[in-house]
C-alpha cells in the first residue's frame, strides 16, 4: 500500500506539472485573505460563476480590513446571485473577527483557522497549505470522487466510517514536501479529468491502476448513504405599491435568504391558482380595502439544496397606506441598491418596468 500511495502522489504531481493547464485568478496565491475569500465563494458554487464574484470582491475590498469596514447591505448586494447567503453572513463575521481580534492577519495554525466562522476542515486545509505550505490535505467532492474510484472504495462518503476513511487516506496520500502543489493538483484533476459525469478515463494517467475503471464502476463510485429529500414551498409575493413606492422588508428570521430584502410574502401550504389565492383570508389580511390587483406573473420555480420554491408575484396598487406593518416604503429607483434573493431578481429582470 505504501508504494501505491507513493506512486499516486508522484504521478499526480507529474500530471499537474506536465499537462495541467487550468488557470484561475487565485491559483498560486499566497495571501491567506485572498485564498479564504476564494474558498468561501466557491463553496457550493461553480468556478465559472465564482470567478467574476471573486474579482469584484478583490477589487472592492483588497484587504480583510476593507471588507470588515464595509456596510453589510453593500456586501450583500455584491453577493447577490451567488446564493447560499449564510456564506455571506459568515464572510462578514470572519472579516470583522480577523480585523478586530487578529490585527488583520489570518492565523497560521490549522486549529485556529477552524474556529473562524464558516471555515471547516476543507477551507482550513486550503489556507494552511496554499498560504503557509503546511501539510494538511484538502478533502472535498473532487477528492472523494478520485479516491473512491482509484482505490475502488464502496464505503459511503457521507457515512461516519467513510469520512474517517477518506480523510485518513487523503492525508496519507498528501505529498508532505509539496502540500500546496499536491492539493492544487488533486482539485484540478477532479475538475478536469476525473469529473462527476463523462470523466476522461481513456486518457487518464491512472487508468491502468484505477479499480473503478478496471471493474466498470466509474459511474457508480463514489457511493452516498443518504438521499436528499427536498421540501416543497409555495410563495405568493405581494408587490404592493403606494404613492409610487413599494413595501419591502429585510428577512431577519433563521430561514433561507436571511438578511436579504423581499416584498410582502404569503406562504401557502399548497399551490393554488392566483385567482383563488386573492380571495383567501391570507391575502386580505396583508392588504387593505383600497387594494387593486393590477397584474400578476406566472409561477416561477427555484431549486435550492434542500428546498424547491415555487411562487408568483402579484402587483397591487393602494389608494391608502397600510397600517401597523413592519415594512418600509421604498422608491422603485432605490430597489436596485438593495440585495434581493435570486427568486425576486428574476422577476425584476422579466418585468423591468413593473
Regions of interest found by a model, annotated:
Residues 1-22, 28, 191-354:
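Intrinsically disordered, low-complexity, charged terminal extensions of DNA damage-control enzymes
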Residues 2-200, 206-215, 219-220, 283, ...:
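Catalytic cores of DNA base-excision repair glycosylases
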